[in-house]
From Swiss-Prot:
It comes from Leptospira biflexa serovar Patoc (strain Patoc 1 / ATCC 23582 / Paris). The keyword Ribonucleoprotein applies. Signal peptide: none annotated. One of its GO terms (biological process) is translation. The gene is rpmB. The keyword Cell membrane does not apply. One of its GO terms (cellular component) is ribosome. HAMAP family: Ribosomal_bL28. InterPro entries: Ribosomal_bL28, Ribosomal_bL28/bL31-like_sf, Ribosomal_bL28_bact-type, Ribosomal_bL28_sf. Keywords: Ribonucleoprotein, Ribosomal protein. This is Large ribosomal subunit protein bL28. GO terms for molecular function: structural constituent of ribosome. It holds the Pfam family Ribosomal_L28.
Amino acid sequence: MARTCVVTGKGTTAGNNVSHSHKKNRRIWKVNVITKKIFLEDENRWVRVKISTRALRTLRKKGLKVAIKDHGGDITAITPKKYVGITPKAQPVATA
């Protein structure tokens, strides 16, 4: 789905607008999803994710891996398939 949060899995919800006379009209509620670049320290690279603003607050507080784990997600959901199973190369340490 296009408008779905990667961390929480929240998506568009449908329901009714109910007037004072209890007349019901169908409507949808869209999740406030933004595209955000997040740095994965373990893999030493940037990843673009679609994340809800509520999940972004959790992410800033706990970190990406903990936030995804708390919501029952998997980190491989945001990792492109060509990177799954590949360990990042160690960065050379400058000594002077």
